[in-house]
């Protein structure tokens, strides 16, 4: 790069950085477009809308209520991945949607959960079930009569999903609008029989005795997927899909009440989190400058750009930010720092080996690429799986994590490279600006592996032992929060309006004293004097004590205090989704590492190290009695990301060293050397991330502290695992386990026995390296087509 070009690059970088920071901080135009203040936040940070539904039928079954909660959860995720749906009492369902303030608009858009069915034009005797009015369709007789005649071919519960959207017509390349239906296994069979018998006829979709649409059957639909075509606009398609989804609930619901609720953590939660983030970021940048000099300045610019881009993107894509979302951003900052540390440590190593500064910069970026790429792609794969299969908190975390990974790779591999080369081009040639790696004494980690393994076993077993003790003493192994265990909701109408800060300081202590619950969750109903206080499940005696305490302390009217049992906001189905998502994500990471490193032992060691960190942090939750709720899921997923990233950095060094290994070098010495070479990266990355979390812990509100404390333990544990466990574990697997098995690596053969494995040849080293369309125009009749058959 020429000097003039370098000056241009630096000027452009400065201008873009200032512009992005201004956009993220203040925003553009009168509405502040792009500003962080416009980011949609969750119920915990900014409040939202609360809607309570009542089941129409008396005494609905627990199974139907659970199924309805799960389906409603999926339904409201279109507004926010952080929306919460839970059971209230035996026949009510509460829906809480963050970031919105108009309850009526949500109710209109969400639709009234009623009955849905699909009916044929006529019954077997030829009696008409519905007729056209010119502008629509009406039932020709009562729905009860239609049911008795056997004309109902599908019920709402036979519909698995419905999505409205646009597609390109095959016939004339015009834009068409349709609703895509996915049926259950039972619905697939029913609809196949019905459409086969009614080709050329209409099947009407009836919602609460009103005909929404009456598409014509073009062909037998046997694949369980269909499209309703002929819509005049995408809004019409989405509206019909919305009615079908809400009508597919297991039970009919009616709105009982709706309200706007304030932030659960209060406004100070956002301000303290922002302040903690800024302070932490400044400390991290100063640390990087002290450790890496000029490259540290470049890292600071990259981190500032990372933060600004993430905030702007969160705003642009309307992603809801909650505590778990903040976890994803913190993990992203850690990975952004990690990428820069890997690069700059490599540059200093190259300078120490006698290369010129220019050659060292080029070689540093080149050699660091594989570790950065593999570490980030592995975590990105996990986040995409969690995004795909997860729900609620898991999905929200996955969105912010995926965003952070993509942005961190861009700032480290693109921005940092351009700025570093530009600085060199304008005259920063002296190695004193970059530093030189110090020669470290090689640590005999592998030789002391038994000691480290024993320490790890003790740490891992401490969790189950503590769980058993608490289970016998308290009856619960873990200190479950309301998110997981459910509890009691007490609604109180006070004599005066109280803000959340006043509620926390005056009301919450009274509730904690009476109930002994340290995880009280008060929520203010905006525009009223009402406060909803959620606690653990209270007995009738405890409820009466709480009522008396509130009356005595605040002189409230006893008749204005109501209590209701509530279910967990994380339903069993959501927990199932989370577990399945994590298992599949882990398998995908294992397969990717196996593919990239050409040795299953690398992948197996990485997963074992991952489980080690998760179990140690779980032990901390048990011993410290930290409440297990939504933030628990986010914390564990963050630990998984850190663990796998740190492991891959060391394995990348081992892979590189194996490619140039001499026949005389002992494998144990090679692993020890690689661990020592990556020690700087491990320490610096964990220190910088630890700083961010410590500041968050010091300045944050109580809920944030409960999230930050286990995360700090996880970071420390991750550093220990990276240095003391991963390399030694791979060495054991390489030399003791499967030494006689074939190794997947460029057609080479595995070592026949343990002794030969100690002198593995370098040649064994792994290489581095659906829709069917109707084509109908506006005004024409709608029709059913087999989506699955068309895709084939």
Question: What are these model-predicted stretches?
Answer:
Residues 1-792:
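A structural signal for conserved, well-ordered secondary-structure elements
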